[in-house]
From Swiss-Prot:
Record: residues binding Zn(2+): 38, 41, 57, 60
Quaternary structure and interacting proteins, as annotated: Part of the 50S ribosomal subunit.
GO molecular function per UniProt: large ribosomal subunit rRNA binding; structural constituent of ribosome; zinc ion binding
Record-given protein name: Large ribosomal subunit protein eL43
Entries under Gene3D superfamilies matching the protein: 2.20.25.30
Cofactor note: Binds 1 zinc ion per subunit.
Organism, scientific name: Aeropyrum pernix (strain ATCC 700893 / DSM 11879 / JCM 9820 / NBRC 100138 / K1)
Amino acid sequence: MGRTKVVGPAGRYGPRYGVSVRKRVRDILARRYQPHECPFCGSTGTVRRVSVGVWSCRKCGNTWAGAAYTPRSGLAKYFKRYIVRG
């Protein structure tokens, strides 16, 4: 338990890489695995990452490009429309 109290899921790396790197990994993993909202149908918890930057909703079936660890990039707030290939 002592390894994961501060760094959470990044505790799997043990004492390797240093605590500051493992804290950054903790923050990234927390954002990646939190329940995300689908920008098309609005359902929460149905969005899954297909690969790096590719996200898909299991409810409505839409697939879109987002950021590597979150379904919407920082620029997405400026662009309301999505380009969807399907």
